Curated annotation (Swiss-Prot):
Coiled coil: none annotated. This is Actin-1. Keywords: Acetylation, ATP-binding, Cytoplasm, Cytoskeleton, Hydrolase, Nucleotide-binding. Belongs to the actin family. The keyword Cytoplasm applies. Its EC number is 3.6.4.-. PANTHER family: ACTIN. Residues 1-2 form a propeptide. It comes from Naegleria fowleri. Gene3D superfamilies: 3.30.420.40, Actin, Chain A, domain 4.
Length: 375
């Protein structure tokens, strides 16, 4: 396969798309996975108005656009819009000709087979790529941490998964999905800040709350204890300056917001928290490999970026696991992008080059070829 041509790595998340070149240590382009279409067909002549906007451009024009997220809970649900996102990725963000580069795409765990075939078809038929490959997101995160066995808790904007992986292969029967992620935490923070008398309603204000979440929230080691401390002193209080210059004070909301990951009932969800989901996932695996999984719990995705998460995970898993079990939770500092980084590593390995699905193979066998050549 083309040794001299750099492969492209595209990680399509529910909230953000991360894209760049294999061999790089970080993605070149990170933009929101959103499509915006004008609410009215333009009356303004000669404005050069497009029928659709993608990514950051949508954010700046959001008042006049109808917004759509083509990836819901990690799964592509609107292929026309997805095609626009890929087009934008290649031509506007990376500024490359896709027909000249092999492309590594990522997919959610348990992505339906038909979806994977559709991705393959679009890459070869619409973008004429010379070769492509589809890898499971959590597996890439594990590679990025230098492991081939472990359990990944991957939590992004739209969905969380626990994915046990043994010697490089995900174990599908033990993968669990939790429809609780960054977007829900932002919603919950909006709600509890309202109780303090701060009102955030519009989509633009929602972005402000997301920023507050990312900058000020943390996970308590002991929630009840932290609530007591917060009630008795102002040590947890922090101030945040809004874009208009006003300053707001955030107190116990700082740790109440991400506590939802461990106690989904806070937002009325009847689901196990991330710690329990991880435990259940390990329990679905063969007893002989559980020790290897408990010793390699790898966090991945933007929603695992909260301070204190590794300590809390360790504590909760220790309480649930068999008494003698050694538990190690790994939280790599670059975990926000570890899926992309894993893809960058994989696509540049010499041993991986025979794994690409080439245009010729696709033309011979059709979209089904993707199942034979991906893990």
């Amino acid at each position: 396969m083309c040794d001299d041509v750099q492969a492209l790595v595209v990680d399509n998340g529910s909230g953000m798309c991360k894209a760049g070149f294999a061999g790089d240590d970080a993605p070149r382009a990170v933009f929101p996975s959103i499509i915006g279409r004008p609410k009215q067909k333009s009356i303004m002549v000669g404005m050069g108005n497009k029928d659709a906007y993608v990514g950051d451009e949508v954010q700046s024009k959001r008042g006049i656009l109808t917004l759509k997220y083509p990836i819901e809970h990690g799964i592509v649900t609107n292929w026309d819009d997805m095609e626009k996102i890929w087009h934008h990725t290649f031509y506007n963000e990376l500024r490359v000709a896709p027909e000249e580069h092999p492309v590594l795409l990522t997919e959610a765990p348990l992505n339906p087979k038909a979806n994977r075939e559709k991705m393959t078809q679009i890459m070869f038929e619409t973008f004429s790529v010379p070769a492509m490959y589809v890898a499971i997101q959590a597996v890439l995160s594990l590679y990025a941490s230098g492991r081939t066995t472990g359990i990944v808790l991957d939590s992004g904007d739209g969905v969380s998964h626990t994915v046990p992986i043994y010697e490089g292969y995900a174990l599908p029967h033990a993968i669990l999905r939790l429809d609780l992620a960054g977007r829900d935490l932002t919603d919950y923070l909006m709600k509890i800040l309202m109780e303090r008398g701060y009102s955030f309603n519009t989509t633009a204000e929602r972005e402000i709350v997301r920023d507050i979440k990312e900058k000020l929230c943390y996970i308590a080691l002991d929630f009840e204890q932290e609530m007591k401390i917060a009630a008795e002193s102002s040590s947890v209080e922090k101030s945040y300056e809004l874009p208009d210059g006003n300053v707001i004070t955030v107190g116990n909301e700082r740790f109440r917001c991400p506590e939802v990951l461990f106690q989904p009932n806070f937002i009325g969800m009847e689901a196990a928290g991330v710690h329990e989901t991880t435990f259940n996932s390990i329990g679905k695996c063969d007893i002989d490999i559980r020790k290897d999984l408990y010793g390699n719990v790898v966090l991945s995705g933007g929603t695992t970026m909260f301070e204190g998460i590794a300590e809390r995970m360790t504590k909760e898993l220790t309480n649930m696991a068999p008494a003698s079990m050694k538990i190690k939770v790994v939280a790599p500092p670059e975990r926000k992008y570890s899926v992309w980084i894993g893809g960058s590593i994989l696509a540049s390995l010499s041993t991986f080059q025979q794994m690409w699905i080439t245009k010729e193979e696709y033309e011979d066998a059709g979209p089904g070829i993707v199942h034979r050549k991906s893990f």
